[in-house]
Amino acid sequence: MYQYRLVANHLYSQLGGSRGHDAIAQAKHFPKLKYIVQDLPEVEESFNSNLPKNLAHRVSFQPHDFFQPQNIQADVYFMKVVLHDWSDKYAVQIVSNLLPYLKRGSRLVLCEGVQPESYDAHGNAIIPLFLRRLLSSMDLQMLVGANCLERRLADWKDLLAQVDKKLEIRNVASFPGAVLSIIDIGYNA
């Protein structure tokens, strides 16, 4: 599990957290942290049935639509494959809704795909043809299905700059064989 400056008693909010499976898994490993899972109201019953009783004092659910302004102050806001499904216009809106509650030292942690570069600065292929084809097909699926593309690191930086120049990618952790990466973003108030 990627460790993004975990601090005891900090509050972690997962936006679009569904039944809370990620927050529950983290809570089992980090007993001094508190979690709020935010998602649409219709998910709450499913969340409650999924929550182990021994974690109920540290993991809770709050109805929230991430297209609306954030309403809690958390130390870390976490989103897993949330922005992936939205074009830049809507992804900017989702992240912008966090701004009033971000403070110096706040983190935004994304678990998202980071499309690798296919070519170097001289136009030479740096990944095999079969992989370039696979990545292109993923791009086309996202374009047809959600009117967006898989984002490269430069695209993630551009998206964050559209929200606020104080948002800075501090680290990108990719793991062998994994489709998703952890993008650790700090707020320089």
Name what the model sees in each region:
Residues 2-189:
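Alpha-helical subdomain
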